[in-house]
């Protein structure tokens, strides 16, 4: 069962979500022209189990990473007709 994982622009690159994920869906990649890394824009969603630990670990006021479970994906992401 595939879930959608979305990384928003509010991400501060703290890596809390990356470390919280038990299945390594999220990963850090090099950021052009910077020593810091950023979260890869295309998470490996096929490994997502929908635990939402990444959401719980996010310290920003607006969750920078969101997991949309397969049954709520179209409604939550504003894709429903």
Curated annotation (Swiss-Prot):
A GO BP entry: photosynthetic electron transport in photosystem I
Pfam families per UniProt: Fer4_21
Domain 4Fe-4S ferredoxin-type: 2-31, 39-68
Record's catalysed reaction(s): reduced [plastocyanin] + hnu + oxidized [2Fe-2S]-[ferredoxin] = oxidized [plastocyanin] + reduced [2Fe-2S]-[ferredoxin]
Binding, [4Fe-4S] cluster 2: 21, 48, 51, 54
Binding site for [4Fe-4S] cluster 1: 11, 14, 17, 58
Localization, UniProt: Plastid, Chloroplast thylakoid membrane
Entry superkingdom: Eukaryota
EC main group: oxidoreductase
Cofactors required: [4Fe-4S] cluster
Main location: plastid
EC numbers for this chain: 1.97.1.12
Cofactor mode of binding and number, as noted: Binds 2 [4Fe-4S] clusters. Cluster 2 is most probably the spectroscopically characterized electron acceptor FA and cluster 1 is most probably FB.
GO cellular component: chloroplast thylakoid membrane; photosystem I
Function recorded in the entry: Apoprotein for the two 4Fe-4S centers FA and FB of photosystem I (PSI); essential for photochemical activity. FB is the terminal electron acceptor of PSI, donating electrons to ferredoxin. The C-terminus interacts with PsaA/B/D and helps assemble the protein into the PSI complex. Required for binding of PsaD and PsaE to PSI. PSI is a plastocyanin-ferredoxin oxidoreductase, converting photonic excitation into a charge separation, which transfers an electron from the donor P700 chlorophyll pair to the spectroscopically characterized acceptors A0, A1, FX, FA and FB in turn.
Subunit text: The eukaryotic PSI reaction center is composed of at least 11 subunits.
HAMAP family (alphabetical): PSI_PsaC
Protein name from the UniProt record: Photosystem I iron-sulfur center
């Amino acid at each position: 069962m595939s879930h959608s994982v979305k990384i928003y622009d509010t991400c501060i690159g703290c890596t809390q979500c990356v470390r919280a994920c038990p299945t390594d869906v999220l990963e850090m990649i090099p950021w052009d022209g910077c020593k810091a890394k950023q979260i890869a824009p295309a998470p490996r969603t096929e490994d997502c189990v929908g635990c939402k630990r990444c959401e719980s670990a996010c310290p920003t006021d607006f969750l920078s990473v969101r997991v949309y479970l397969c049954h709520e994906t179209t409604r939550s992401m504003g894709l429903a007709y």
